[in-house]
A protein has these predicted regions:
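Terminal, regulation- and interaction-focused segments at domain boundaries
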Residues: 1-14, 18-19, 88
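C-terminal basic regulatory modules in eukaryotic proteins
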Residues: 10, 46-89
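Generic structural signal for short, flexible, solvent-exposed coil/loop and linker residues
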Residues: 10-12, 21, 40, 69
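Short amphipathic alpha-helical surface micro-motifs
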Residues: 12-15, 34-37, 61-64
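Ser/Thr-rich, low-complexity intrinsically disordered terminal regions
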Residues: 17-18, 22-42
Length: 89
């Protein structure tokens, strides 16, 4: 199993907050919003060597969020998967 340092998991939250996002974290899951709506949900799966991002809006994932996640993915040789969840409207 791949071990991700606790500090790196906390650092993801801190970087997103510094970039101006509202972040709620539980273990390896992050709920990211912009104080008006949720933007995405991020799940880190160390065992599978994956970071999965599920976007919750019709817009593309903001570049600063993807850069923060890409940085941690590269550090641990993890695959970054970004998927869109389309609303039923």
């Amino acid at each position: 199993m791949l071990n991700i340092r606790f500090e790196d998991l906390v650092n993801i939250s801190n970087k997103l907050i510094s970039a101006g996002y509202n972040v709620r974290r539980h273990c390896c899951e992050y709920y990211i919003g912009n104080f008006e709506k949720f933007i995405c949900v991020v799940a880190v799966f160390p065992r599978w060597k994956e970071i999965r991002v599920y976007t919750l809006t019709k817009d593309t994932l903001p570049k600063d969020i993807s850069e923060i996640l890409r940085e941690i993915a590269e550090k641990y040789s993890m695959k970054l998967i970004i998927r869109s969840i389309k609303s039923r409207s």
